[in-house]
Amino acid sequence: MPRKRMIGVVVSDKMDKTVVVAVERHVQHPLYKKYIKRTKKYHAHDEKNECRVGDVVEIEETRPLSKTKRWRVVKIIKRFEPERILKEEEEVQDELEEIEGEVVEEKGGAES
């Protein structure tokens, strides 16, 4: 039987050679038939300590490695890029300042 594989996001990397991966799945409510997000956290073995919080990783079922660890990181699918987010936030701040400046000029001109 093949081993189960899942894709999730690293939510904690504070332990040595272990990461906590949150896996999100959609289930249908039994009565209302609406699809709901369900999240479960798995402890996964990270041999090289290369995963960081925010990384999207693929984990695979393995033999029990500790009391709670039964998964291992197979590969990092996408790295988390905080620099890109900071640049986007700075651009948004600049645009807001420009808009606020234009609004102040319009109000100042109307009062005179």
UniProtKB/Swiss-Prot annotation:
A GO biological-process term: translation
Transmembrane stretches, start-end: none
Pfam families reported in the protein's UniProt record: Ribosomal_S17 (PF00366)
A GO CC annotation given for this chain: cytosolic small ribosomal subunit
GO MF term set: rRNA binding; structural constituent of ribosome
Keyword rRNA-binding found: yes
SUPFAM superfamilies reported for this sequence: Nucleic acid-binding proteins
Gene3D superfamilies in the record: Nucleic acid-binding proteins
Keywords from the named record: Ribonucleoprotein, Ribosomal protein, RNA-binding, rRNA-binding
Domain of life of the source: Bacteria
Quaternary context: Part of the 30S ribosomal subunit.
Family: Belongs to the universal ribosomal protein uS17 family.
Functional summary from the UniProt entry: One of the primary rRNA binding proteins, it binds specifically to the 5'-end of 16S ribosomal RNA.
Name of protein: Small ribosomal subunit protein uS17
Source organism (scientific name): Thermotoga neapolitana (strain ATCC 49049 / DSM 4359 / NBRC 107923 / NS-E)
